[in-house]
Structure formats: C-alpha cells, structure tokens
Amino acid sequence: MTGNIVARRYAKALFALAKKAGKKAPAEYGKDLEAFASVLEGSPDLLKVFANPIISADVKKSVLSGVAGKIGLKPMVINFLSLLADKDRLPCVLEVSALYRTLLDEAEGVMRGQLVTAFALADARQDQIKVKLEKQSGKKLVLSFAVDPSIIGGVVLKVGDKVLDASLRAQLEILKEQIKRGE
C-alpha cells in the first residue's frame, strides 16, 4: 500500500511537469517511461541492481544513463529517473509507469479494456465492436482482444474496474443456481 502511495505521488509529479512542458510532452514522457519499464521487466537482473540498497545511487545512475542512452529517453525523464535513483525508489518505476499511463488516459479521455471471446474474431469484426463501444461510451477505447474457450460463447468485457459477463458459461451458472433454488 505504501509503495502504491509513493508511486502515485511520483507519477502525479511527472505528469504535472509534463503538462507544463507542452501539449505533446505528457504522451512522450509516458512512452519513455513505458520503454524504461519494459526494459526492467525484460531484465530481472537489472531490476535487482536498482533494488539493491548496497549499490550506491551513483552506480545506479551510471547504469541508468547507459540504459537511457540506448533507448533514447528524453532529458526530463532521465532527470526524473535519476531522482528516483537518489531516493532509492527505482524499483517503483514499474508501478509509476502504470499509474502515469492511467493519468494520461484520464487526461486524454481514453478508456482501456479487454474483450474476451470463445473464439478469435476477424479484424473487421473487432473494429466493428470497438466502434460500437466507443459510440456507447462517448470516449476513445483502447481494446485488447483475448480468446478463452472456457466461456463457451458470448463475450466478457472488462473496462477499468467494471466487468460485463455476457458469456454462455455465466448464463449457465445463473441457470444452475436458479434450478438449485427451485425457481
């Protein structure tokens, strides 16, 4: 919980700086932060180096500058990550990145979601569904599609913290409960 509060504060601080830096800066900083987070996710050893309290902040910052140079991070993002290194908070960067993405989505009026179906949908059908959902919500929707044969049929839509389960499996479970209760 404490890590989440700390990560939220850092994400809000970077987002506030990005808004002051210009119209395109929030999205650019977000891409840089996500790129750095994906490097850390792909290299657990690097994350261990940043999480190790025995390694000095200077060593962490030199490793950070090497990584930043290879992936081409913006100077403000490098400064932000250096601050995290000074405060021994670099292990929080994955959480900071996710929270920053949430702040950016809210500012841009974007919702993220996942649509689960029993079988793969054609690209044209995916586009139709996305357009229809965007019309209903009035917001831009970034939708990922997944396949789960266990739902038997129908769809399960997850957007934010809401879940709409219109799967055949869920309907069968409801029917089963009604039969048990004698309805």
Curated annotation (Swiss-Prot):
PROSITE patterns: ATPASE_DELTA. The gene is atpH. GO terms for molecular function: proton-transporting ATP synthase activity, rotational mechanism. Belongs to the ATPase delta chain family. Keywords: ATP synthesis, Cell inner membrane, Cell membrane, CF(1), Hydrogen ion transport, Ion transport, Membrane, Transport. The keyword Disulfide bond does not apply. HAMAP family: ATP_synth_delta_bact. It comes from Solidesulfovibrio magneticus (strain ATCC 700980 / DSM 13731 / RS-1) (Desulfovibrio magneticus). InterPro entries: ATP_synth_OSCP/delta_N_sf (IPR026015), ATPase_OSCP/d_CS (IPR020781), ATPase_OSCP/dsu (IPR000711). NCBIfam families: ATP_synt_delta, PRK05758.2-2. Signal peptide: none annotated. It is a peripheral membrane protein. It is found in: Cell inner membrane. This is ATP synthase subunit delta. PANTHER family: ATP SYNTHASE DELTA CHAIN (PTHR11910). GO terms for cellular component: plasma membrane; proton-transporting ATP synthase complex. F-type ATPases have 2 components, F(1) - the catalytic core - and F(0) - the membrane proton channel. F(1) has five subunits: alpha(3), beta(3), gamma(1), delta(1), epsilon(1). F(0) has three main subunits: a(1), b(2) and c(10-14). The alpha and beta chains form an alternating ring which encloses part of the gamma chain. F(1) is attached to F(0) by a central stalk formed by the gamma and epsilon chains, while a peripheral stalk is formed by the delta and b chains.
